[in-house]
Amino acid sequence: MVGSYAAGGGRGAAVAAVAEGKLDELRRRMGKADGDLLRIVGVGGGAWGSAFCALLQDAYGRHRDKAQVRVWRRPGRAVDRATAEHLFEVINSREDVLRRLIRRCAYLKYVEARLGDRTLYADEILRDGFCLNMVDTPLCPLKVVTNLQEAVWDADIVINGLPSTETREVFGEIGRYWKERIRPPVIISLAKGIEASIDPVPRIITPTQMISNATGVPLENILYLGGPNIASEIYNKEYANARICGADKWRKPLAKFLRQPHFIVWDNSDLITHEVMGGLKNIYAIGAGMVAALTNESATSKSVYFSLCTSEMIYITHLLAEDPEKLAGPLLADTYVTLLKGRNAWYGQKLAKGELTLEMGDSIKGKGTIQGVSAVHAFYELLSQSSLSVTHPEVKKLVAPVELCPILKTLYKILIKRELATDSILQAIRDESMYDPRERIEMSQRQCLYRPSLLGLPKVDITQA
């Protein structure tokens, strides 16, 4: 089956033995006694969260006496008739999926839904291996729980598959269920986006910070996983790599546990840069989609846009980290693939083609939340604050950081203020007065841009840093 780690003969036995060894090693590190399951819980039923949990189920689900993978998603989300019809086509195009559903006595309900005689629900189809935001890519069957307390109360590892816009609310509720816990769980966040707070001082709040604040789980137990992750491609065994970022205590053992033959996971200590880049890339992906649509997929225009937007991203990270991780490896690959393909780039294309409008909102059927929209607002508001002023390299005067980010400014005026049309993004990258993006990068490295207060850290004398 595509997406399964099952293999025949000796190779299958070898793969299973390696997986069991990694599972046993993590169980020992987490202090699990014999007979006490390692409970892995995915929170959120979006495409990447569901696919990630399905990867773990494929890898470790066979060891039922040692590990359990389950997913929480909200109940009550109905599958519309058009999606049900398409899902039926997908099922019948895949013999392995068709046989599995017949064997599980689950096929008939999809026939009835196609005919309009039955309503399917998102949690119901996820149990059968279908994510509502990714029905073209069948997953393995998953254990799905719709009661949040039941799902998370005894979790050892929690996978945050929620959008950043929902993370605070859901983990605030989870925090109430964990008040009596003696040992905090380990949390791996897949969320890509940030919140901005202006009062009392400008600062960003990343998903890992939201989770820690909401639950009381120490930051050393909360990690971020990012990389070039197109969910359907990774589940279908397209080769990919990723980084798990956070404190020393957990990132190395988790990198080893998560690594699969086609999904290579490295570890990195720079949590902030990776989380911030995870939010920034969604912003610039919307613009990339617009450029692609408006230029008839011009490779030259897209490459010009890529060079300009990555220089803005590098500049912004120097405000948030004293020595930010270089835009290379999985960090660069994540940016590239998101600008090339993904829901945010898709959204930008549809806006530029007139097939979607801003009035339709940023939650799109079959795609989920377009996180780049809220990220545009957050970063623009944050970087507009005069208290963060930097020296303009040409006029030698203090300006708000956003004044050195013309693409971010343009996207804000298109998406949030709605003052400009989508073709304004082309004017932003074709401005004759624009300087070489290399100059922005050199300026960020030359000037002391780091503002620890943006992370809620005490102010330091950066001239002596």
Swiss-Prot record:
Protein name: Probable glycerol-3-phosphate dehydrogenase [NAD(+)] 3, cytosolic
Catalytic activity: sn-glycerol 3-phosphate + NAD(+) = dihydroxyacetone phosphate + NADH + H(+)
GO biological process, one term: glycerol-3-phosphate metabolic process
Cellular component terms (Gene Ontology): cytosol
Transit peptide is among the record's keywords: no
Top EC group: oxidoreductase
Top-level taxonomic group: Eukaryota
Disulfide bonds listed in the record: none
Molecular-function GO terms, alphabetical: glycerol-3-phosphate dehydrogenase (NAD+) activity; NAD binding
InterPro entries linked: 6-PGluconate_DH-like_C_sf, 6PGD_dom2, G3P_DH_NAD-dep, G3P_DH_NAD-dep_C, G3P_DH_NAD-dep_N, NAD(P)-bd_dom_sf
Primary role: May be involved in cell redox homeostasis.
Membership in a protein family: Belongs to the NAD-dependent glycerol-3-phosphate dehydrogenase family.
Keywords: Cytoplasm, NAD, Oxidoreductase
EC number of the protein: 1.1.1.8
Binding-site list for NAD(+): 44-49, 192, 231, 343, 371
Entry keyword annotation includes NAD: yes
Location within or outside the cell: Cytoplasm, Cytosol
Pfam families: NAD_Gly3P_dh_C (PF07479), NAD_Gly3P_dh_N (PF01210)
Main location: cytoplasm
Annotated residues for binding of substrate: 192, 343-344
Residues annotated as the enzyme's active site: 281 (proton acceptor)
